[in-house]
Structure formats: C-alpha cells, structure tokens
A protein has these predicted regions:
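Hydrophobic transmembrane alpha-helices and their immediate loop junctions
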Residues: 1-221
Length: 221
C-alpha cells in the first residue's frame, strides 16, 4: 500500500478499503464462532465491528508493505462440529469475496469498465485506478476485498483457512508439531511477511489464480 503514496487519493482509498475489509472479516468470523459455541469471544469485544479488535498488527504491516493483510485469528471452540469448523474457517473470506464481486459488478454496470483480461492484483500493486473518483473507489475496494478474502482462505496460520486444515487433520504428533511451529512460534506469520516483503510476486501469483477468474466472471472481462 505504501507504493501508492505517490497518489494520495488512491492511498486513502486503499487504506479505507483495507480497514473495512479486515474489520468485516474479523467481525463476521467472530460472530460465527460465537454462534458455534464460543462463549469467551464476547468477553474480548470482538462481537462489535471495531477495527482495533479485529486488525492484526502483523496483518496491518503486511497490508502496508505488500498490499494484502489479515485480521486477528479466532480461536476454535474446544467442542465444535465439523460444520462449525468449516463455517468459522470460511465464512469471513467468502463474505469478502462476495462483496468484492458485487463491487466489481457495480463498477461494470455503472461505467462498462472490465478487467480487460488483465491480472487483477496488478491494480493493487500499481495502487491506482482510472476513471472518476467513484470508479476508482469501486475498482480499488473490489480488488482489496477479493484479495483479502482469498488470502484468508489459504491454509497457513494465522489465516482463517488454517483453522480448517488443522481442525480436520489427524491429531498425530507430526500435525501437532507443525501447528505449534506455524502458529504458536509465529513461523506462519514470518512466512507471510517474507512473501509480502521479499517475494510479493509469489503471493500475488497465488491470489491472482483465484481473483482474476472471479473478476472476469463479475465483469465479463
């Protein structure tokens, strides 16, 4: 996101979109966890859409430097069904993807702008969008929502998708050690930050594989 400082309007649009996307993801995931039996999450204040409760500091750093961040992870309830596990892991990310597609559709219907077959996260890396202020806001926010939503579904701690991987995995010693190293010792965070800072092309390639087809579907591009 810092690369957009040369264009203050685009930077502010990206910043606002990222704050809203991360807050929405964390809030939705928290509400789903509470309804799945987590009685402690209400005590953390995460059942309110408060950015201070939902934006992960490392995720904010990833967003500032690499353009894509993540929200504070939600702990899994001790007693949970597979349905609850799947809902907690996927609902927030899928909600962001849905919002992103609706924003792209609104942009397409209002201005007949499409992605033109281009890689969608190129917009995120460039930090700019053409057209009027409203069109730029729709384009940048849609890409932020789509990218953040897809990133959250990847099975790497602290991302929500990892809850599904480790929640359904056998409780063998190997899996438990992997979970401990990636989550408790923050190697998962380190891997994400390294990709954001040193090899952003790899992270964007992963996101593009999912985001660009969705954008083309929404806009007919």
């Amino acid at each position: 996101m810092l690369y957009a400082l040369r264009d203050p309007v685009s930077f502010l649009l990206l910043l606002a979109s990222t704050v809203v996307a991360l807050t929405l993801h964390g809030w939705i995931t928290s509400v789903v966890a509470a309804r799945s039996g987590d009685r402690q999450i209400a005590l953390t204040g995460r059942l309110r859409p408060d950015p201070r409760r939902h934006i992960d500091p490392y995720g904010a750093l990833g967003a500032l430097v690499g353009g894509i961040g993540w929200s504070v992870p939600v702990a899994l309830p001790a007693r949970r069904s597979k349905g609850a596990l799947i809902a907690i892991a996927l609902t927030g990310g899928l909600a962001l993807v849905g919002v992103g597609m609706l924003l792209l559709l609104a942009l397409h219907l209002s201005s007949q702008v499409s992605t033109g077959g281009a890689r969608v996260t190129a917009v995120l890396r460039a930090g700019t969008g053409g057209g009027s202020l409203g069109q730029r806001a729709l384009l940048l926010s849609s890409v932020v929502f789509l990218s953040t939503g897809i990133l959250s579904l990847l099975p790497l701690p602290p991302l929500a998708g990892s809850r599904l991987l480790f929640g359904l995995a056998p409780r063998s010693g190997g899996w438990q050690r992997a979970e401990y190293q990636l989550e408790e010792r923050n190697f998962g965070v380190l891997a994400l930050l390294v990709m954001s800072l040193l090899v952003p092309g790899l992270l964007y390639a992963i996101i593009d594989a999912f985001v660009t087809p969705l954008a083309r579907l929404a806009t007919g591009g």
